[in-house]
Amino acid sequence: MQEQYNPSEIEALVQKHWHDTKTFEVTEDQNKEKFYCLSMFPYPSGRLHMGHVRNYTIGDVVARFQRLQGKNVLQPIGWDSFGLPAENAAINNKTAPAPWTYQNIEYMKNQLKLLGFGYDWSREIATCTPEYYRWEQWFFTKLYEKGLVYKKTASVNWCPNDETVLANEQVQDGCCWRCDTPVEQKEIPQWFIKITAYAEELLNDIDTLDGWPEQVKTMQRNWIGRSEGVEMTFGVAGSDKSFDIYTTRPDTLMGVTYVAIAAGHPLAEIAAQTNPELAAFIDECKNSTTSEAELATMEKRGVATGLYAIHPITGKQVPIWAANFVLMNYGTGAVMSVPGHDQRDYEFAKKYHLPIEAVIKPAEGDLDISEAAYTEKGILFNSGEFDGLDFDGAFNVIANKLVAEGKGKRQVNYRLRDWGVSRQRYWGAPIPMVTLADGTVIPTPEDQLPVILPEDVVMDGIQSPIKADKEWAKTQVNGQDALRETDTFDTFMESSWYYARYCSPQAEQMLDPTKANYWLPVDQYIGGIEHACMHLLYFRFFHKLLRDAGLVNTNEPAKQLLTQGMVLADAFYYTNDKGARVWVSPLDVATTEKDDKGRITKAIDKDGNELVYTGMCKMSKSKNNGIDPQVMVEKYGADTVRLFMMFASPPELTLEWQESGVEGAHRFIKRLWKLASEYVAQDNSEALDVSKLTSEQKALRREVHKTIAKVTDDIGRRQMFNTAVAAVMELMNHLQKAPQTTGQDRAIIGEALSAVVRLLYPIIPHVSFTLWNELGNTNSIEDSQWPVVDESALVEDSKLIVVQVNGKVRAKITVAADADQASVEALGMADEQVIKYLDGVTVRKVIYVPGKLLSIVAN
């Protein structure tokens, strides 16, 4: 065996072996327990970053561990390859999105292979290929036939100069990224999928996701946002019109002093016809890109409509205001305002001098609304017949009264909105709907699927090529002229079902149910927590749609979810002559000075610029602190990068990139290599004979088997890969100090090395593969079994007992593991150090903690 560890050489050889033998290609095997391990697939941006490497290393560790447990392990990979970045890159590089995307896929595929990930490449998918999206289109038409798809107008960002729709990312400071024209809001028809039809099931089934992080489950519960309340009808004074309001706090109904409606509400539109100030306000609101998230921080503004609402119980008239904090697409577009008991309503009322009435008081103590609203639940007062009721009592009595009088109804509402899947972009899957000459809209017939996106296009940066090309939209359906839909799907569509397509990627149907039901659900899913409320919710929703279409037979797509933390790196900049910050890569920092706590106090780059150190932050292009994985692999080898990624931090927490830590990981692998090299060079013919072992040899063997037990639990159950690595490192310290003099010495080292290379195989597979062969094994490590703990090796022949005299440690004695108290006392009392402290005193009491402590009290 080579004495020196040469990563580039062994990694190339091992990767060639995996490729030639198709090691990780799997098929369904009913006689083996399956394990489906999946990491969220990458967008082919051009190069892998360290966040990818962490995600995929975790997945590979889990997959390889499960393989050595004897399971039939599927670990596929593919490309989430539609999306806006490809359009922008195509414009900048004067090419089309397709060649840019396919070129990136090839480059990144090579990077993944260099890192040694054990993927079944025969199942590779790219979502931008017709072979993939044809089934997405087919499924959409089936959802339409089921009544789960509909079209309605919805607001988009509109550039009036270019006459085009802009993605949110293309709006910069309220203006078009390209021509700097102020962006307007425009209502256009768009397609929606009724995720709200599954809101209750999506919410209830969160309770079945035992293997998902609580944080993700809480985020999804809040996003779905179930609430119980009352929908009630307010009349409009002086007319026969009325409008509905939903509230979760009917107990505050008697404190309503005004009503706020959205600028787009029909009543506001009517009032604006004779109110120029209101008309201007409505136009301003229409052209703002306010999202629900921004409402909390924006300035609350409004205009009185001149209309009055009639209170459904008292009949009192209260003014109706148009307000910028009410959204037409959320709820009914109108809210009852109770400034005494809602802080937003309170601030608005103060600003516009509207009355504030208190109708709820605390059960104990005084009520004070001079500075802020009282928002807690309490006891009703100033509420007529409802005085003295608490929240629950008032909710029921007021709801019952409104229902009895035909002015309201109890209602369960969800914060969740239906999923708008239309995008006015080019690089996405065409939506398979057509409009006939008579205006009828129907799905594209199945025999005309897929609706293929043309790839040979020119991007002008203004309009989607399939919108600009009037000929592309023209088609025929059943002999009639028709026009294709020119919108494309939201790219979350592709990532909502890719996990299922991996089960049968070549199937001439959406899924092969037999194969899908063998592999699904995913046993371990890995990805960032930033996907909690979008991808991970659509992922769950789509699985239920697939179930109801008879394609899968389970309720949820993934049993376990691991959300890995971000990768951080040092960030440095200097200010140039123009006063702009120039961010410098950590790799270009020539010298640093640190304080006694190891914090960087001074840094200079290769060009001599004195740098400002801003601390550790997420690797990003904007701060130029990303570390190219390929550079690290070329310098240290893939196994070193993988080992550092697993050792530096628990998987859910952020990982701080430190090249000193990478160097430490590299040194550890070299130590392992050296130990194996020394062992292989000796005569190792003597087999292990447990009956011949000395106490020292038994102690070393005990450490080996304790480590096997710990690493098995750390990787398999706890998923604490960092502590698993630490345990092996600790064992290596023992092994390096151990003698290799006798045949039994070497037999224990041999047993230990056999275990260590398998324990580390999921993390450093190239080194483990090579050392396994060098240790004389005839089978491949991939076909071996995970090491098993020898329980008898864990049994200790002796125990170390601490002896105290009057609470102070005076000696440590070794006793037989099964020694009784009398034997331990006799040995303890006979110890020379203990005798010294018992001279001239009387022993009053002896306390024995079995296997640990002998405490002598004397005076």
From Swiss-Prot:
The keyword ATP-binding appears for this protein: yes
GO molecular function: aminoacyl-tRNA deacylase activity; ATP binding; leucine-tRNA ligase activity
Sites where the protein binds ATP: K621
UniProt key word ATP-binding: yes
Gene3D superfamilies cross-referenced by the UniProt entry: 2.20.28.290, 3.10.20.590, HUPs (3.40.50.620), Isoleucyl-tRNA Synthetase, Domain 1 (1.10.730.10)
PROSITE patterns, alphabetized: AA_TRNA_LIGASE_I
Superkingdom of the source species: Bacteria
Annotated catalysed reactions: tRNA(Leu) + L-leucine + ATP = L-leucyl-tRNA(Leu) + AMP + diphosphate
Keywords tagged on the record: Aminoacyl-tRNA synthetase, ATP-binding, Cytoplasm, Ligase, Nucleotide-binding, Protein biosynthesis
Main subcellular location of this protein, as a coarse class: cytoplasm
Motif ('HIGH' region): 42-52
Enzyme class: ligase
Protein family membership: Belongs to the class-I aminoacyl-tRNA synthetase family.
Record-given protein name: Leucine--tRNA ligase
Species in which this protein is naturally found: Shewanella oneidensis (strain ATCC 700550 / JCM 31522 / CIP 106686 / LMG 19005 / NCIMB 14063 / MR-1)
